[in-house]
Each structure stands twice: as C-alpha cells, then as structure tokens.
C-alpha cells in the first residue's frame, strides 16, 4: 500500500464518517417539520419493510405539518401505524386518503436533551475520525519499518492525514453547532 493509497483511504473513510453523522443528525427532530424525518420509518409492503417514501408521496403542508399521501389507498392504515410506532413521538391523523403528521412543539427540557444527543453523536464521529487518523499513521509507520518510504515522507504524509483530520473535525463541529441552533430555535 502506497502513501497515496493510505491518504485516499483515510480521506474516503473520514467522508463516510461525516455522511453517517449527517444521516444520524437528520433523524433528530427539531421544532420544524421536514420530510427527511420520515426517511428511516419502514412500513410493511407485501411482506417486506420499505421506506415510507417508496409507497407514498411525502410533502410539507406548513412549518409544523407533513402530509403523507399513499400511492395505494390500502397502505394508509399501515403507514399511519408505522409512523405512530416509530421512535419519533409523532401522532399521525388519517384524513381519508391523506395522512397528516403534525409536529408537536418541543419543550425546553426536550430541546436540552436533544442538544445533548447531538453533542454525543458529534463526539462519536470525532472519535471515529481520530481512530481513522491513528490507523493511517500506523500504516505509514509500517511502510517506514519495511523501508518502503523515508521518515521524511512519513512525516509529510502524517501532516497530510492530520490536515484531513482537522478538516473533518471542523466539519463535524459546524454540523453540531448548526443542528443545536435548529433545535434551540423556537
């Protein structure tokens, strides 16, 4: 494995850590409605679980209401049940062919709890990025030990990996601050 391969691998895996964080932050509810909140809710469709977005049209009605319109009328009941049983704390209301999902306002205490969850997710992502840095540095040390690269090349490569790590940690911090601001906005 070359220095370029190690750097590329670290960069790719750090980007995946950022994507994972972004996906987990998207699931955390803020006071405002957004269609992405239902992305991970699965509904039984002919015996197999599928995301709601594959069996229904999901739209925003206003800042606090999501409208779910099933492609098949028979799916209204199972979709409503899946939303109600999800861990999102939502209470869907069936209106004939359409299901309305009002977003309850977050209490101050719930907002604080959610910001703690956001910080925890961010810390987990930072730990993952730092572990990737450590793995890359260990791979570089192995190259030096096997006399494939010089110590100067190792130092330069470690500096590159450190820059990637710093950039990833900075991006994580920005995501956390942004999500906390969304949650705390009343």
Curated annotation (Swiss-Prot):
Query: Main site of residence?
Result: cytoplasm
InterPro entries documented for this protein: Ribosome_recyc_fac, Ribosome_recyc_fac_dom, RRF_sf
Matching entries from Gene3D superfamilies are given as: 3.30.1360.40, Ribosome-recycling factor
User: Which key words are in the record?
Assistant: Cytoplasm, Protein biosynthesis
Renumbered to this chain, the signal peptide range is: none
Presence of keyword Protein biosynthesis: yes
Localization in the cell: Cytoplasm
Which Gene Ontology molecular function entries are recorded, alphabetically? ribosomal large subunit binding
The source's domain of life comes to Bacteria
- Can you quote a single GO CC term? cytosol
Keyword field contains Protein biosynthesis: yes
Which Pfam family name is an example for this entry? RRF
GO biological process per UniProt:
cytoplasmic translational termination
Record's family? Belongs to the RRF family.
Name of the protein this chain belongs to: Ribosome-recycling factor
Q: Which species is listed as the source?
A: Bordetella pertussis (strain Tohama I / ATCC BAA-589 / NCTC 13251)
What does the record give as the organism's lineage? Bacteria, Pseudomonadati, Pseudomonadota, Betaproteobacteria, Burkholderiales
């Amino acid at each position: 494995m070359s220095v370029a391969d190690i750097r590329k691998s670290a960069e790719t895996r750090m980007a995946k850590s950022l994507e994972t964080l972004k996906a987990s932050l998207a699931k955390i509810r803020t006071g405002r409605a957004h269609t992405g909140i239902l992305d991970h809710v699965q509904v039984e469709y002919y015996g197999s679980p599928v995301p709601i977005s594959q069996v229904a049209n999901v739209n925003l009605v206003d800042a606090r209401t999501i409208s779910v319109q099933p492609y098949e009328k028979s799916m209204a009941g199972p979709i409503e049940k899946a939303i109600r049983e999800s861990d999102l704390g939502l209470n869907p209301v069936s209106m004939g062919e359409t299901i309305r999902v009002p977003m309850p306002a977050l209490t101050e205490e719930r907002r604080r709890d959610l910001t703690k969850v956001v910080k925890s997710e961010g810390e987990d992502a930072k730990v993952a990025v730092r572990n990737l840095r450590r793995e890359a540095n260990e791979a570089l040390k192995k190259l030096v030990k096997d006399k494939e690269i010089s110590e100067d090349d190792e130092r330069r490569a470690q500096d590159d990996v450190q820059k990637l790590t710093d950039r990833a940690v900075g991006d994580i911090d920005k995501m956390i601050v942004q999500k906390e601001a969304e949650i705390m906005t009343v």
